[in-house]
């Protein structure tokens, strides 16, 4: 049989059997699958609009009741109630953290796609002036309240069309993203077991509503943390020759480390090396016995070359001054990279199918990080950004700001795109 161009009709005998040509091959998905697939796209958009008030209400509830990383007990309890209220009862609460998963089983056998939302808040005192602002000293300043609401909205949509799904949808509600620990906790309790693909979305304060960015390639950088301890020998400030000044050594190391960025790194590969904390001594006229620096490395490189470069500079610089220094280097999260061609196509196609080409945003790669990438080490994944900024409404503050908020009109769109991605992935990979 000669190859059939994408989008063309299958031969008559295959068409009668319910075959569709998708992703370069014929898929049998049952009688009238093509018509049913088209109807599902319309249903998802319409259902999202129907549930818009629900999604906004849930966002406001979780915004008003934030909980810090590792303390999300009440948040999890309420999410469970919300899921059970829509008829989703196959729920697993993790034992060693406040994470939770729920399974939505489709009407036909197939693969399992996971949709993920993070649920923790930040230790920020809110100054948004919203009538539903938090009052407990912490705040959903990174948009996790919106993520919960969008995933609950997607769950409600998919629950309504579950009979048409060729596979299952696993809902992942992850704690402790803000401290880059929750994804690892969930992996240790096998939250990704049985999952074939993963999708996540982040509401973003520098992307205009109602755009949705599903760009391929680099999306968010890794997060590495380092500590440098420089040994010294204490002496009076009037007699530095009798001691060994670790602050001077630390300053030299700090300056030299920028060679990793400007002289050892391909300039086409983004790299940030920031020393954000330096401490040494407690008295204005006494040379201390130690200096300590802490900082972060952000890059899209997956290897350990930056650590090795830093270690060589730290060690050799200290030796040049006749002392020693130690580098402690922690790999907290890998980069978020949309590198699976199939998932990239499905993710973009979901936005276009629902809202047209004009709805596709373009956000450049970000040097901030997301521990979604830890879950993404297990299976192919795709990560999207939902625009939350609306200058006309005065919604202009970025994520982490004490006055941060989002254009709530975009939340139902975020829910629809998540649901559409899940439905399309399951349709394309149907058994």
Segments from the language model and where they lie:
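Aromatic (phenylalanine/tyrosine) cluster motif
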Residues: 13, 21-22, 26-28
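Acidic/His- and Gly-rich active-site-bordering loop/insert found
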Residues: 38-140, 145, 149-165
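Divalent metal-coordination and catalytic microenvironments
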Residues: 62, 102, 115, 144, ...
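Histidine/acidic-residue-rich, glycine-tolerant segments that coordinate divalent metal ions
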Residues: 100-101, 122-124, 128-139, 146, ...
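Metal-dependent amide/peptide-bond hydrolase catalytic core
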Residues: 251-431
């Amino acid at each position: 049989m000669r190859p059939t161009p994408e989008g063309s009709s299958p031969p008559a005998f295959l068409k009668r059997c319910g075959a569709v040509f998708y992703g370069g091959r014929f898929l049998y998905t049952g009688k009238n699958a093509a018509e049913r697939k088209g109807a599902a796209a319309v249903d998802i958009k319409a259902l999202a609009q129907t549930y818009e008030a629900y999604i906004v209400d849930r966002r406001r509830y979780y915004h008003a009741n934030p909980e810090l990383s590792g303390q999300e007990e009440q948040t999890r309890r309420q999410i469970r109630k919300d899921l059970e209220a829509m008829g989703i009862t196959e729920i697993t609460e993790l034992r060693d953290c406040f994470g939770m998963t729920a399974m939505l089983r489709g009407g036909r056998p197939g693969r399992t796609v996971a949709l993920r939302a993070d649920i923790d808040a930040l230790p920020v005192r809110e100054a948004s002036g919203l009538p539903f602002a938090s009052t407990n000293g912490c705040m959903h300043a990174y948009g996790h309240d919106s993520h919960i609401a969008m995933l609950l909205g997607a769950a409600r949509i998919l629950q309504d069309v579950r009979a048409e799904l060729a596979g299952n949808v696993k809902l992942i509600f992850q704690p402790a993203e803000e401290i880059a620990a929750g994804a690892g906790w969930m992996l240790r309790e096998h939250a990704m077991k049985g999952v074939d693909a993963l999708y996540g979305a982040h509401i973003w304060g520098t992307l205009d509503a109602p755009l949705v960015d599903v760009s391929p390639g680099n999306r968010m950088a890794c997060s590495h943390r380092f500590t440098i301890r420089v040994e010294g020998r204490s002496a009076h400030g009037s007699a530095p020759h009798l001691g060994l000044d670790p602050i001077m050594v630390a300053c030299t190391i700090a300056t030299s480390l920028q060679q990793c960025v400007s002289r050892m790194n391909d300039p086409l590969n983004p790299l940030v090396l920031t020393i954000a904390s330096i401490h040494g001594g407690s008295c204005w006229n006494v040379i201390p016995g130690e200096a300590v620096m802490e900082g972060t490395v952000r890059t899209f490189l997956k290897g350990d070359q930056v650590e090795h470069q830093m270690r060589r500079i730290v060690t050799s610089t200290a030796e040049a001054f006749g002392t020693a220094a130690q580098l402690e280097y922690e790999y907290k999260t890998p980069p978020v990279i949309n590198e699976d061609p199939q998932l990239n196509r499905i993710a973009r196609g979901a936005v276009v199918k629902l809202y047209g080409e004009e709805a596709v945003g373009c956000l450049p790669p970000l040097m901030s990080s997301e521990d979604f990438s830890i879950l993404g080490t297990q299976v192919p994944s795709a990560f999207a950004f939902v625009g939350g900024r609306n200058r006309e409404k005065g919604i202009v503050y970025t994520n982490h700001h004490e006055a941060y908020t989002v254009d709530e009109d975009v939340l139902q769109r975020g829910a629809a795109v998540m649901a559409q991605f899940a439905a399309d992935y399951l349709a394309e990979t149907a058994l």
